[in-house]
Amino acid sequence: TVSACRVEVERTCAFIRSHYARHITLEELSLQAGLSKSALVRAFAKAKGVTPYRYLMAVRISEARRLLERGVSSAEAAVETGFSDQSHFTNYFTAFTGLTPGACRELFRQEWEMWQSIPSLDVL
């Protein structure tokens, strides 16, 4: 049953988190989980509230956000998180976050500059 597949779903999540930067197919995920493709999609959606593909995209976007926070370019973030091209990356990033990758990176840059402008509090 779908509710009995928690271990398989968690195994799939761990696999996605470890391999998000490369092309992952539903076939590959189902083999990792030891379930048919349809059983995996049903169990995953029931356990996580999203499809395995949507989960993969969320992991990729989360990692891309972390890279942008560190000042990595949008193009480099796209490549490092497994997107086939920058346009595809920008569309997904904007859909997930409400910001373009460039706008997100700029927000982090502005926040960093703000913190750098605050005088040091050397009280020790």
Regions found by a protein language model. Give the residues of each.
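Residue at a beta-strand N-cap/secondary-structure junction
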Residues: 23, 71-72
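Basic/polar phosphate-binding segments, predominantly the helix-turn-helix DNA-binding elements
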Residues: 17, 23-59, 78-107
